[in-house]
Structure formats: structure tokens, C-alpha cells
Design a protein with these regions (language model features):
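Mature N-terminal segment immediately following signal peptide/propeptide cleavage
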Residues: 41-68
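Predominantly a core beta-strand signature of beta-propeller blades
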Residues: 47-50, 95-99, 142, 160-163, ...
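A flexible loop/linker signature enriched in serine peptidases of the S9 family
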Residues: 53-56, 73-83, 102-108, 123-152, ...
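Short loop/turn segments that connect beta-strands within beta-propeller blades
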Residues: 88-91, 156-160, 200-204, 264-268, ...
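Residue-level detector of Asp-centered blade-edge/turn motifs that repeat once per structural unit
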Residues: 64-65, 115-116, 179-180, 223-224, ...
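Hydrophobic beta-strand positions that form the internal "hydrophobic ladder"
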Residues: 69-70, 120, 184, 228, ...
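Blade/loop signatures of beta-propeller domains
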Residues: 26-46, 150
Length: 364
């Protein structure tokens, strides 16, 4: 698995505004839909279309009207993730050209689109430095960086009128918005541990929802705003606790047995959904409010690098595998009507580890 900072796996391309992206789009023609799916994937995915071409593109999330996707990308000439938007459908059926909406400085992650006020949301390190933050030290194994310079910002949909939303010390990222636009859920180390918080859309009325030692993060609201799905790993033994605290003090975590959890919007009713001991992440609700789609490497216990999409009932029953490609698939999100699915995948890449966004019709 690659770097997954926020719900993350990516980095982004900058270029001059979106010229670099346009060039990347022109490098590759539309692939035939049938070539983008394995035979097993045809049960739930049809008429798949590749949306981005080249670099690393991930965390693609629909606007509330499903007409746009906001995502992060890193590519040739750009060392750090930046945030872009792209039209889902174009009149000429050609790939749309992504538009840069973040500052082009520092590293950005975890973007989302407000439902009604023409603004976007993302986290960035640019206030601390215009340069990329340092890469993590992998001498202690595979770790994720938790940059304490991440702050949450809002901006107009074109990237102008940038406003700081959170200025608490520590890591502040992984933010998503309720469909009524009134509340934000996010992950922060402001109290010394990686916990989930909510706040109003203006940054006020901050409430801590999780309190158990360990990583609680990657939260997403249910469609009715009454529940939150998230990923968590809570160390149990003295050795695990010591290792977790030592790494966190260095701005790192070691992703291991991440499980999917659900809680009510006020933090009550926490319950574990998956129990497979694998790395499960990027959970998102199906519009029916009963099922959760997520990414996991449970089918690759030996190497742990092959992540696929699964769907499961909130009570942990009825789990079904959705993707079968022999590499990474992650960051799934349904359209509001549940008829289409966007996700990030290594399939059809022209370079090793290339990650692109794909859109498919969802079949029950």
C-alpha cells in the first residue's frame, strides 16, 4: 500500500495552473471500457471510464449534485499533492481538464466540496512552508507521516478567498462535510492523540468524539448526517502502546490492523464493523444508509499490497468483494443516487504505481 495520509495515498501535480494536467490527459486516449475491468468485477461495475491519466490521483469525491469531483494529484514536475476539481461528464465525451484549486504550495490532502455555498474544503501545510514537508523515516518499517503543519482551509470553488478554518496545534486533516453543509468531521492531534472531532462549518463549536488511545480517523458522514463511519487501530499490549506513542511523538504512525467502525454523530454507539485483522480504510456509506463500501488488503495477507473494494452491512454481515484487480483499488464513493461509483486504482497505468480515478455504473 502506498502512502495514505488522510484517507490518503497520493501526491499531486502542480504545473502552471492546470497545463500539466492537460498534457497528461493528452498522452493517453480513452481505453476501451471492457479492458478496464476483470471478468469478476462485471457483477457490480459496468461501463467504466477512466477520468485521469498519469501521476498519482486519489481521494476523488463527488459534489452534492454529482457533477464535479474534487481530488488530489501528484505527477511529473510536482513533488507535493495539490487539490484539483474535474467535471464528471463533458459534452464531447473527452476527458475533462482538471483545474487547480489549492495554492500550489506545501502539501495538501483531504478535500471536499461544500453542498451549497460554492466553497471547497482541504488541508494544507503551505502556511508552515511552501516546500514539501520531509518524507518519513522508513528505518522503522512502513509508516505514515502525520504532519503537524496540516491546517484545514476553505476557499471558493476556484481556489480564491482562502480562509483558515482550524488553527489548533498539531495534525488537522481528514475533514468531510454533512450533506446539509452545517457540520464538519475531522481528525486531529490537538489533544495529544489521533482522534475524531466535529465542528460547525465556520470552525466553531468543536467537539471531541473519540477518546481511546490509538488512531481514529478517515471519518465520513452518513447521508442523513446521523452516523459517522471511520477507520481505527487501538494498541492493546504494552509493546504496542509504547511503539504507538513513540512513533506518534515523531509524527508517524504504523498502519497495521485498521478496522472499520461506526458511531453516532455525537460519538455515542461506537461499534466495530470489520474484524479481519487486515488494513481496512477509506470507508464510505452507500446511499441506502445500511451498507458501507471500503478498501482492504484482507485478500493479500502475505504481501499486504493488493487492496480491493468490499461492501458490507453496517452490522458486519453480508460482506462482498467488488474489485479483483491484482493491485491497488481504494477511495470509493457513490453518487447521491447510488447509480455510479468513483474510485482510485493502479489499473491501466503506463508507469509503475500510477494511480488514476475511474468511474463506473453500479449494478446491484
Amino acid at each position: 500500500m502506498r502512502r495514505i495520509e488522510c484517507v490518503a495515498i497520493v501526491a499531486t501535480f502542480l504545473g502552471l495552473n492546470y497545463v500539466g494536467v492537460a498534457m497528461a490527459q493528452e498522452k493517453k486516449p480513452d481505453a476501451k471500457p471492457a479492458s478496464l475491468l476483470t471478468p469478476e468485477e462485471g457483477k457490480h461495475l459496468q461501463n467504466v471510464r477512466q477520468l485521469t491519466f498519469g501521476g498519482q490521483n486519489a481521494e476523488g469525491y463527488f459534489s452534492i449534485d454529482d457533477k464535479q469531483i474534487i481530488f488530489q494529484h501528484q505527477g511529473e514536475g510536482v513533488p507535493c499533492d495539490q487539490i484539483y476539481t474535474i467535471d464528471v461528464d463533458t459534452t464531447d465525451r473527452k476527458p475533462a481538464v482538471p483545474k487547480l484549486v489549492s495554492t500550489g504550495k506545501g502539501r495538501t490532502t483531504c478535500s471536499y466540496i461544500f453542498p451549497s455555498n460554492g466553497r471547497i474544503l482541504f488541508s494544507s501545510t503551505h502556511a508552515a512552508s511552501a516546500e514539501c514537508p520531509p518524507k518519513p523515516d522508513y528505518s522503522r518499517g512502513y509508516v505514515w507521516p502525520i504532519y503537524d503543519t496540516y491546517r484545514i482551509y476553505t476557499a471558493k470553488s476556484d481556489g480564491s478567498d482562502l480562509k483558515l478554518l482550524t488553527d489548533a496545534p498539531g495534525y488537522n486533516a481528514e475533514a468531510t462535510i454533512t450533506r446539509d453543509g452545517k457540520h464538519i468531521v475531522f481528525t486531529s492531534t490537538r489533544n495529544g492523540d489521533l482522534d475524531i472531532y466535529t465542528m460547525d462549518a465556520d470552525g466553531k463549536n468543536v467537539k471531541q468524539l473519540t477518546h481511546e488511545l490509538g488512531y481514529d480517523g478517515g471519518p465520513f458522514w452518513s447521508y442523513d448526517g446521523k452516523k459517522i463511519v471511520y477507520r481505527a487501530e487501538h494498541p492493546k499490549t504494552d509493546t504496542e502502546i509504547a511503539d504507538y506513542k513513540d512513533l506518534l511523538a515523531k509524527g508517524l504512525i504504523r498502519p497495521g490492523n485498521l478496522e472499520i467502525w461506526v458511531m453516532n454523530a455525537d460519538g455515542s454507539g461506537k461499534h466495530q464493523v470489520t474484524h479481519n485483522g487486515a488494513a481496512n480504510f477509506a470507508p464510505f456509506w452507500h446511499p441506502d444508509g445500511k451498507r458501507i463500501i471500503f478498501a482492504s488488503n484482507m485478500a493479500d495477507p502475505k504481501n499486504g499490497r493488493d487492496f480491493d473494494l468490499y461492501i458490507i452491512n453496517e452490522d458486519g454481515t453480508g460482506q462482498e468483494r467488488i474489485t479483483f484487480h491484482p493491485d491497488f483499488d481504494g477511495f470509493p464513493m457513490f453518487t447521491s443516487d447510488g447509480k455510479r461509483l468513483v474510485w482510485a486504482s493502479n489499473r491501466n497505468g503506463t508507469q509503475p504505481h500510477e494511480t488514476n480515478l475511474f468511474l463506473a455504473e453500479w449494478v446491484e
